[in-house]
Amino acid sequence: MSTSVPQGHNWTRPVKKDDDEEDPLDQLITRSGCAASHFAVQECMAQHQDWRQCQPQVQAFRDCMSAQQARRREELQRRKEQASAQH
């Protein structure tokens, strides 16, 4: 009696057209101007595997994002005021 080796499946994973696109979170961080501090957090976490040892990097990233959010709020407020002044 001969035993045949089962063939593997021939399924193929559908290729997404957006595979080449950058992750939306990475895009957001890059646009914020905080990519360098985010990278520092990632690098520290990869090295230490313990977020507690990365608190200076985490705090720097938090400060950068907070400043960016404050700038964004101010910009939105200015646009809102300009729009209401035109009406």
Curated annotation (Swiss-Prot):
Pfam families linked: CHCH (PF06747)
Compositional bias of kind Basic and acidic residues: 71-87
Highest taxon of the lineage: Eukaryota
Entry's Gene Ontology BP terms: mitochondrial cytochrome c oxidase assembly
Annotated PROSITE patterns: CHCH
Disulfide bonds: 34-64, 44-54
Subcellular localization, as worded in the UniProt entry: Mitochondrion
Domain CHCH: 31-72
Keywords from the named record: Disulfide bond, Mitochondrion
Short motif Cx9C motif 1, span: 34-44
Short sequence motif Cx9C motif 2: positions: 54-64
Annotated region described as Disordered, given as residue ranges: 1-24, 68-87
InterPro entries, A to Z: CHCH, Coa4-like
Compositional bias (Polar residues): 1-10
CC per GO annotation: mitochondrial intermembrane space; mitochondrion
The family this protein is said to belong to: Belongs to the COA4 family.
PANTHER family, alphabetized: CYTOCHROME C OXIDASE ASSEMBLY FACTOR 4 HOMOLOG, MITOCHONDRIAL (PTHR13639:SF2)
Function text: Putative COX assembly factor.
Protein name: Cytochrome c oxidase assembly factor 4 homolog, mitochondrial
Organism per entry: Mus musculus (Mouse)
Gene: COA4
